[in-house]
Amino acid sequence: IFMLNINVDPKKELGAVKPLHGINNGPISLAGVHNTEKEYAEMGIPFVRLHDTDYPYPQAVDVYQIFRDFSADPNDPKNYDFCLTDQYIAAIIRTGASVIYRLGTSIEHMEKKRFIAPPGDYDKFAAVCCGIVRHYNEGFADGYHYGIRCWEIWNEPESDLMWSGTTEQYFLLYETVSKALKKEFGDTISVGGYASCGFYGIEKKEEERTVFQKKFIAYLSEFIDFVKKTDSPFEFYSFHYYGIGV
């Protein structure tokens, strides 16, 4: 059993506590049936990350839901369908929360996987990602000027439910997309990832780690080495923690 003890000295001032009550996905759910904007605002949710939106049947946010024909021109506004994603993000903005936008796709538990394979054209995929950022931050395709800061490249590529390619293929995707985003948008955005499954067992000695635990630690180490070697933009690291006993 994992236990954490927190000791508080009320006589010592350390400054403001960073907000820790961000949440995954916005107030609109079940294809618009429920809207909890009021509750989000009352709770003061500081940021909302977009992943597995309207799971298990996503219609918005995912790159392949917005840009459905990858033979089309990513520079042409008419090839994007932002309608549902616009509504979804507008509801988040109205609550006062900031958006963390995951560029990629949702998890696929079914036997047939549709969107988790490496893109056929990495440069075109990066161009589409730029189009999405441009829409929400620079008004492209009748868009907005939200100033969304954090753009996360994919989610859990260590998992075969999220990425059917190799480790090297994901690393190349990260390099391609991150460099394209920073080239166009510079310091107006931050790019990172890779929304890791976690790094379980990192507190243990090497010989005490399970094969499962070693996998995630090795992936992180290899990723850090890769972004250093390729000078890929890497401005934040995101990860998940799935609880005790892993």
Language model features with spans:
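Non-catalytic accessory regions flanking glycosidase/transglycosidase catalytic cores in CAZymes
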Residues: 1-150, 164, 168-198, 232-233
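Aromatic- and acid-rich polysaccharide-binding/catalytic face
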Residues: 95, 101, 129, 147-155, ...
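Aromatic- and kink-enriched transmembrane "portal" helix at the membrane-lumen/periplasm boundary
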Residues: 157-160
